[in-house]
């Protein structure tokens, strides 16, 4: 049985198009066809083919948003349901709501730019682009599927391409970084499988793993706490949460520029999305008790990673720890019981995806010219690479949350949402906000000092001998320009993004607040006994644009 339900479709034809299935299958089928693409030996035809596939995928996701997605609805849209293995409860079920649609668009957008960033790759280009396209389909599937077993399969599918992209095209320690990545991520994925099976078979009868069926089940509080803890570990590795983060600096330290963009731009967001989708939406009673822990872990992420970034002399590792620090705001937003704070967490994921991808692409472009990642060996290249310096400066300012940039809006929404969240006691809110503010202060210090060490001062003798200290080429300017357009656009007018998911966030927060009200004895005195009312509408957050 095949069912389509494209809510909000603008025309009858759009209502019959399986947009999300196409966005998953086009890159996967495109990857399977890569071995059959004729090539003259330099990989040129394969590059253009892969770029075409990623652009088609991006256009499909944009068409899905324009023709079949209605931001004013909070429920599931673009639904597709095909009975697969009914005896085992397996169904091909995909759909999109405010939690997933923005991330689907982000995935297809960044992957198309990563494909363009991979243009200089000359070693085994056929295999490289095969893995890149397979990863694209797997990541879109993570956000689009509506069945927990399918989610697990998609989660595992994208791990294999990342492992091979690290192990084959990475740096000197690529085998170590790739092995550490797969051990952390694949090992923690076992908790997802166990939780999926436990939740699917809960209550007896025919098992069902669809999100709607799981949300309708009345899980006991002890069962919810156990599943929540396991899923928190699995998703905490991918986010990542300190101390489950150590794979990320090693992976970033050895990855190439396009893999950097996919890791920072998309992979980390899978952890944040999964926390909202499963821990908050399907296990609300457990979330009401774990939320203070998420807040504390978020502060640890912000401060610890910012301080560690200070000590890094390797450019890639410095930006990697900066990413971990910024993802701490996602944890605080997810742990808040306010629509504004949770909306800020969602916007922070999108904002960091764009900013992180731009910074890591610039790291790769800089390494191609200087052939070093050590800040001690850099300096004085600003005169020879003025455009590159300008691109670095704008992206660094975006990362330190300059007003008018998307990072400023998202972090301010998290702060404002948590600070005004009456679900927590006032002393707890004051302490958390003050500690998180320390990370905000540290960020411009280590980012601006990094720019000074790269571009200012006296040029090192080792760099003088290089003849390839050329300025940014048009391809590089185009990639950064494409990333800066939404960064600045969201910073100046946040409703460009917040309107696409505000209704879903309100519904999610309302569910969590309802669960908190049913808890008669909170796990800690950090949470008040009485929950506040859910904010009525979150269309345009009251955040200054500049």
UniProtKB/Swiss-Prot annotation:
This is NAD(P)H-quinone oxidoreductase chain 4. Keywords: Membrane, NAD, NADP, Plastoquinone, Quinone, Thylakoid, Translocase, Transmembrane, Transmembrane helix. Its EC number is 7.1.1.-. One of its GO terms (biological process) is ATP synthesis coupled electron transport. One of its GO terms (cellular component) is plasma membrane-derived thylakoid membrane. InterPro entries: NADH_Q_OxRdtase_chain4, NADH_Q_OxRdtase_chainM/4, NADH_UbQ_OxRdtase, ND/Mrp_TM. The gene is ndhD. The chain crosses the membrane at residues 17-37, 48-68, 103-123, 127-147, 149-169, 181-201, 222-242, 256-276, 290-310, 327-347, 348-368, 389-409, 430-450, 477-497. PANTHER family: NAD(P)H-QUINONE OXIDOREDUCTASE CHAIN 4, CHLOROPLASTIC, NADH-UBIQUINONE OXIDOREDUCTASE CHAIN 4. HAMAP family: NDH1_NuoM. It comes from the Bacteria. It catalyses: a plastoquinone + NADH + (n+1) H(+)(in) = a plastoquinol + NAD(+) + n H(+)(out); a plastoquinone + NADPH + (n+1) H(+)(in) = a plastoquinol + NADP(+) + n H(+)(out). It comes from Parasynechococcus marenigrum (strain WH8102). NCBIfam families: NDH_I_M, PRK02546.1, PRK12561.1. It is a multi-pass membrane protein.
